[in-house]
């Protein structure tokens, strides 16, 4: 019996024990993120975005955040984590109308669309913080993100590089989830 990709993803999410879900992909972990409870772990990349902002003392509370991307892996969970930090969040995607204008309204822009070089200078303004979550192999064979870094970096206050930005912190978050899960298991 062949399963469709979407059906296969659902099956995998349901088959994994939430106690062993370090990257927030099970329905139980997702529910905990959406409900704001501590029952599971948020997806590591979404948690990495929030951790980066906090590490660099970038205010989140009351800030306008635009998230480009609506996936279960990054777009939706990072939006909910930022809402929990009292940000005002707008979720957009590659087909959102007037996307550059919406992006320029943000204090913090999270680019997680899965399209290499989708966001350039036309979509940003001075004073913004940009978290580039994408990772792709460019036409030149080098890694690149969802932003056109060389265009965006001179305009904004701060931007995460690709490689060496969000992905690096994602690995650290995963390790912290593994340690926390081991501690939980040891205390049961």
Language model region names:
Residues 1-7, 11:
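Single conserved hydrophobic/aromatic residue that forms the stacking wall/gate
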Residues 31, 37-125, 129, 144-147:
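Glycine-rich phosphate/diphosphate-binding loop of Rossmann-like nucleotide-binding domains
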Residues 2, 51-54, 176-183:
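Short glycine/serine- and small hydrophobic-enriched flexible loop segments
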Residues 2, 17, 57, 101, ...:
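Structural motif
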Residues 4, 46, 168-172:
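Short alpha-helical patches at coil-to-helix transitions and adjacent helical residues
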Residues 5, 72, 95-96, 135-137:
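Glycine-rich beta-alpha junction loops
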Residues 9-23, 27-30, 134-185:
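Rossmann-fold NAD(P)-binding glycine/threonine-rich loop
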Residues 100, 185-188:
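Short, conserved aromatic-histidine micro-motifs
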């Amino acid at each position: 019996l062949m399963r469709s990709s979407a059906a296969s993803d659902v099956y995998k999410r349901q088959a994994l024990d939430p106690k062993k879900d370090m990257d927030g992909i099970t329905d139980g972990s997702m529910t905990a993120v959406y409900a704001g409870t501590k029952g599971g772990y948020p997806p590591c990349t979404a948690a990495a975005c929030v951790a980066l902002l906090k590490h660099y003392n970038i205010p989140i509370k009351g800030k306008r955040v635009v998230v480009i991307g609506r996936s279960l892996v990054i777009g939706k969970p990072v939006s909910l984590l930022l809402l929990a930090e009292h940000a005002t969040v707008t979720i957009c995607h590659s087909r959102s109308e007037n996307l550059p204008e919406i992006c320029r309204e943000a204090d913090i822009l999270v680019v997680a669309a899965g399209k290499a070089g989708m966001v350039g200078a036309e979509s940003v303004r001075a004073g913004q913080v940009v978290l580039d979550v994408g990772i792709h192999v460019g036409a030149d064979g080098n890694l690149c993100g969802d932003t056109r870094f060389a265009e965006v970096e001179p305009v904004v206050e701060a931007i995460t590089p690709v490689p060496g930005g969000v992905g690096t912190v994602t690995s650290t978050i995963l390790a912290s989830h593994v340690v926390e899960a081991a501690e939980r298991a040891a205390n049961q």
